[in-house]
Amino acid sequence: MTTSPRALLLDVDGTLVDSTYVHVWTWHRALAEAGAPVPFVEVHHRIGKDGSTLVGELLDIAGVDDDEDRDRVAGRAKDLHSEYYAEAGDSLRLLPGARELVRGAKEQGWVTVLATSAPPSEFAEARELLDVDDAVDAVTTGEDVDTAKPDPTIVAIALERSGVDAADAVMVGDATWDAVAATKLGIRSVAVRTGGIGDAELREAGFSDIVDDAAGVLDLLSSGRL
């Protein structure tokens, strides 16, 4: 008797790579320099969300109302964020158990997909750091979609590339938007705490399980709880 293959759809930023607070800092700095200062907490709770949506919401908070001003400030902030994030590349590190999770899942027969909507340049840094291409079956990047999470399209593409049905897939992420997107597609989702979001928010977003980090996800896999 053969069993159907299962797919592990892995968010990257904040889940496998310790980049959440790098994004918080660089967006915060970029918005302030572009003329739209906002509190750090407002940036943090939007990390992982589609970039244009993130910026639009933060411009609302900053009180930038004029359409022409919004376009100018948004464009400048996005350019600065890309610049500052690239400068911070040397500070990126893997999160606990990241590489082991990808390799362990593959060894256990899972189809593994790096399901990110990061720009290709940012993903390339993370991919090099992870060094698990031989254990990855498919990837996505921001080039695959017009709008990122919580819009489910990027997760739908990751699922399609896995060749597995939604009922046999699990999404792993650190942000509420990962669960929102997965739930829309009928995909179970598991949260890691490495993005700095509290358990109550993660549960409310729809995550079925919450663990400390990628190592905890591997424990779930190895014990048959996923």
Predicted feature locations:
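Residue-level marker of regulatory loop/turn positions in helix-turn-helix DNA-binding domains and
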Residues: L94, A115, T147
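Asp-based, Mg2+/Mn2+-dependent phosphohydrolase catalytic module
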Residues: M1-R6, R103-K106, P119-L226
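Bulky hydrophobic/aromatic packing residues
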Residues: W27, S91, W110-L114, A126, ...
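Conserved phosphate-coupling serine/threonine residues in phosphotransfer and NTP-handling enzymes
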Residues: T15, T116-A118
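Short, flexible loop segments at the rims of nucleotide/cofactor-binding pockets, characterized by
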Residues: G89-R93, S117, S189
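N-terminal helical cap/lid subdomain that shapes the substrate entry/recognition surface
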Residues: T2-R103, E107-W110
